[in-house]
Amino acid sequence: MSRVSFIDTTVLCNLVPVPGRDQNADEVRREMKERLARGERFILPITSVVETGNFIAQVSDGQLRRQTAEKLAAILNLICEGKAPWVLHDVAWDRAFLKTLLDGADTMSSYVEHAVNKVGAGDLCIITERFYFQERSSVRAGIWTFDAGLRAHA
């Protein structure tokens, strides 16, 4: 399998784009083209979908909110259909996932230590989801993000 990257909310909001959260949209589109040309594949972690969906729900203009929601829905449908460059990653939200999250996945720091260092639970969920993907697939995966705290673990 070619390189795989988990897409953080900061990038997904620019890909959709979500009004007010798309300040890097041109840069993201340009980088997406470069990554696609290299054969990179992408996974949308649950956290990114939920957070982006919440940001869309906060768009004040109803028509723009609908158009933006339709764009995110189109991306999610491509994932459901297994269409490249998207990879569907099945992950269970269960006791094992929560325990791994609390242990900090493969970061060698607990959730509490991450929180103290300003790495949120959402970011740690992405790290944990990536950990499970790598364990199951034996494919090293990165995280594409603009978030400095998360980038330290990308």
Give the positions of each predicted feature:
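Short, well-structured N-terminal submotif of metal-dependent ribonuclease cores
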Residues: M1-T47, F55-L72
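Alpha-helix capping/helix-boundary segments
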Residues: V11, S48, I126, G149-L150
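Surface-exposed alpha-helical segments enriched in charged/polar residues
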Residues: R30-A37, N77, T128-F131
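Phosphate-coordination/substrate-recognition cap region in phosphate-metabolizing enzymes
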Residues: E51
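Acidic, glycine-rich loop-and-strand cores that form catalytic or ligand-binding grooves
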Residues: K71-I79
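Active-site neighborhoods of divalent-metal-dependent phosphate/nucleic-acid chemistry enzymes
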Residues: C80-G149
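Short active-site loop/helix that positions an aromatic residue
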Residues: A152-A154
